[in-house]
Amino acid sequence: MENELNSWTLDFEDTVYRLLKVYMESKESGIKVTQDDESNGTPVFPTLLIQQIGFTEAGRDTESYFINAIRPTFQITITNKGKREKIKDIAEYAVSFFKSKNFDVSNAVFTVSKQVRTATFRASRIIGAYENLA
């Protein structure tokens, strides 16, 4: 029973992934949204990789056996071939998604290497155990 009380913290990454995938696929035709940083076969462009790079516990009570809230940090990496404006448009959609869910967005970086453009940023917020992102 105690394990079930805190399982939401481990499921949260998948919840955000599913919501982001639906949102991005409605905004950008043909985008691949994934949690896996490795894939077999030919690369697909554009691709959005979402990874939860950690979380800290927040809102501890005196007994400390139940996780009341967490502050997860997600790193979003978008890759695309083509014009800089296109990857910026895709990044703006992704940032808009996170802002609509009350995340703080930081560390936006744009790079290019061998004709592949990359946009990376992080998103973080405190989320309570009984909050609903949808």
What are these regions (language model features)?
Residues 1-62, 85-86:
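Small/polar-rich, solvent-exposed N-terminal microdomains that initiate assembly or binding
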